[in-house]
Amino acid sequence: MTHDQVLDMLKYLGMGNRPEDKVKVIFVPCYQDGKDGILNKHYYDLLLGEDLSVYPSYYEPWGYTPLESVAFHVPTITTDLAGFGLWVNSLKNQHGINDGVEVLHRSDYNYSEVADGIKDTIALFSTKTDAEIKEIRKRAAQVAEQALWKHFIQYYYCLLYTSPSPRDMRRSR
């Protein structure tokens, strides 16, 4: 036993990164700042080399990592407990990993369902042809483009001009 749940599970599942294995796991439990002593590459340099990212957030007000992933044309799996996942669910014509982002429903009580959803999505993605993956990457980048500030600022203006000012709030007491 290694005293690390991730490494123990990888060993239990027989995921040993053998040459014949179709899935390779890179597990680096540290911040990728280019000086980690393992990969010595910055996070964004590593992200560019990924086929698919998985961020099964339990709670994030927004969730920048899946957005960063799709901004770099890397399809991603996230959950609806991240603001980004909720936002993606609100998009029209967004139907899962084939459109660049798979959003899984997550709660306090569905750990196994989320794990199965991740497994199933990775398995589905691994069957895609190079041409299909190229198209999925393009769609992932299109999702990221919709999250640019030039599209979101309108909502901030709406809040700014429709919310009561602090002065108005004091008067209503």
Which residues are covered by each model-predicted region?
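Single conserved hydrophobic/aromatic residue that forms the stacking wall/gate
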Residues: 161-173
